[in-house]
Amino acid sequence: FYNRLFIFFNKNIVHTQDKIKLFPLGDEDKYFTPSKVSKIKIIDINGLKIATLICFELRFPTLWEQIKGADIILNPAMWGIKRKEHYETISKALALVNQSFVIASNSANDNMAKGSAIISPFGNIIKDDNKTILEAKFDKDEILKVRKYIDIGLN
């Protein structure tokens, strides 16, 4: 079994990705098979470069390097209440370091941290733990602006 993510576009599956870093405290390694790092990649949807880190994978900076240059990074997750601050801090750091938008989507279950957010490449956060849906318009110019202003070689 795999912990698998599906990305849909125009009613079609355009990408699947299996989790590579299984969470040991959740005994995921007993139930799932880890995938390979090479499976983490940037995909193109309508000119947007999109990448995904699944849950616990957020904690591994070597994986951040793997998705360098993505415009949007997705992070579906189930981080617990005790690690809420970690989740929010690491998600913001990912946006700043990779100069990309991050969509951090954490479980809203009562035992989970919530903390879902849309984070801009400048680190600005759209977040509301009381909402079930967050939405924002992405401006690719904002990505280009930060990458030009603070040039770390991502253009």
Outline where the language-model segments fall.
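Active-site catalytic loop in hydrolytic enzyme cores
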Residues: 1-68, 83-85, 89, 145-154
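Short acidic-glycine loop/turn motifs at beta-strand connectors
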Residues: 8-12, 119-122, 138
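A short acidic/small-residue loop/turn micro-motif
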Residues: 20-23, 131-135
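Generic structural detector for well-ordered beta-strands
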Residues: 44, 135-137
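CN hydrolase (nitrilase-like) catalytic-core segments centered on the catalytic cysteine
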Residues: 59-134
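Long, non-catalytic architectural segments outside compact domain cores
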Residues: 141-143
